[in-house]
Amino acid sequence: GAIAAFTSDAWRPQILTGDLTVAMCYSADANEVIREDPNLDYALPTSGSSLWMDTLVIPITAPNPAGAYAWINFMLRPDVAARICERLSFATPNREAYNLLPPEVKNNTSLFPSESALERCEGLIPLPEANAIYDRYWTKLSSG
């Protein structure tokens, strides 16, 4: 096998046409592609993976903090959070929203991995002292 590309989305058409047999991707993207081709599957490496989350924040300089709070509160409504989870394939930490999800979404292990799978995963933290090293090797890797 060979490395086909280092991009965030070039794998999509390649895996759907069969030009790739494996790709590293975000779980939400994998779910989207699996909806197009149910013969594909998502696997979390047995060694684990990185954990990530999207967050909503309000900058201290926000021109309309009240509007920002209203938006966040809207996004946190269980019915809205459940729809976001279903439509975008992003897991929700909102327990009330989770309870509104259909069984096929609740049982989707790419959205809601088992506790044992999560124990093998870890969050990513910034390592400013390593940025120059990462940048040097990434440039070497991605430039061929």
Which residue ranges define each predicted feature?
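Sec/Tat-exported extracytoplasmic proteins
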Residues: 1, 19, 34-37, 60, ...
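Mature extracytoplasmic/periplasmic domains
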Residues: 50, 59-119
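Extracytoplasmic/periplasmic, Sec-exported soluble proteins
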Residues: 3, 7, 50, 59-63, ...
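Non-transmembrane alpha-helical segments in soluble domains
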Residues: 12, 16, 24, 69-76, ...
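Conserved C-terminal helix/tail region of periplasmic/extracytoplasmic solute-binding proteins
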Residues: 115-144
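Ligand-binding pocket segment of bilobal, Venus flytrap-like solute-binding proteins
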Residues: 1-45
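Short amphipathic alpha-helical segments
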Residues: 54-56
